[in-house]
Amino acid sequence: MMMDKRGIKKIINEVTPDIIAMRRHIHENPELSGEEVNTAAFMAEKLRSFGVEVEEHVAGTTAVLGYLKGGKPGPVIALRADMDALPMTEETGLPFASKSPGKMHACGHDGHMSILLGAAEVLSRIKDDLSGTVVFICQPSEEKSPVGGAKGLIASGALDGIDAVYGLHVWPTLPSGTIGVLPGPMMAASDHIRIVMKGKTSHAAMPHKGVDTIVAAAQFLTAAQTIVSRRVNPLYPAVLTFGKITGGTRYNVVADTVEIEGTCRTYHEEAQDAVETYLQDTLKGMDAMYGTESTLYYERGYAAVRNTPVQADFIAGVVRQCLGDEGLADVQEPAMTAEDFSGYLQHFDGGFFWLGATPQGQTVYPLHNTHFAVDEKCLPIGVEIMVSLVLAKTA
């Protein structure tokens, strides 16, 4: 079958019931990061049924790679979907809601996987006319920040030889079926911060005989908020949030240990470097003032997801060809949430985009919300864009 636009849409219409059925099966059978055993087996089974060569347990994980070789020589283009769910109890009320209490596809990975499988089914039908090879990446542990699943997969060398890789994320704040893409950063770098402050216990009535880590921690948390407002270049956005603090053993004992955990989100390495440096400097000041001994554990997690201007224009052009100008959402700014797809873009050419997933007029539930669910009408559109990206790169 010739790979014209009309022919592709016809195939997508034919396989849309399969796409929806696969999405519903995945949605009601969620598995957490690193535990995607049944999910991976399902992905492998479906890929094989489309005539795709499959490799399982890649890099010693649940990762699955599928290879579809076209009838003509050409580049190697990869499409990626993440497989893991979140430790949340679903409240969508869907007839195909999660069957596993405390586990839910609340970040749309069920949509990502069904789109990947849909793209595989479509491309397999036209493989004789396809130039090059398509690699389907079924990645575990995207939610397992700050390590994630992409890093190990890339480091294993299993993806060596790829010429370009493309990924998407369903996006509830965009109208269903529209595409959002930006040059430069689209999603933020995500770093994990852990601080341990050590002091000395004493009776609460004799605080001068101890070293109070709770007081020191309180001062540190206040002082740290000036890092973003006064030490980081204001042209480089940064978010510094501490979401957890633990310390003390009893109400009338001066606490000798406090642990603080938080995250830093940035788009630029300059801001990332500045936050880490000034956190360390602030802790040194607290130690000098209060007599504490503090240790900063600053773990750099996912890098920022960045599209080159060339790739952003390429994706936008494909969207216009498929959906017209109205298919491109008016996206003005990136997000401070993170995605380990950035790891692929640090090693390979490629790009990333958002797929609108909420019907107009309906309540917008954010990602990681117990009520979030992907609008199934956006799924065939995601398939069309993924397939069209492959065809445009291999033409």
Task: Give the ranges of each region predicted by the language model.
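Acidic/His- and Gly-rich active-site-bordering loop/insert found
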Residues: M2-H105, D110, S114-L130
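Metal-dependent amide/peptide-bond hydrolase catalytic core
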Residues: A218-A395
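Histidine/acidic-residue-rich, glycine-tolerant segments that coordinate divalent metal ions
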Residues: L86, T92-M104, G111, L117, ...
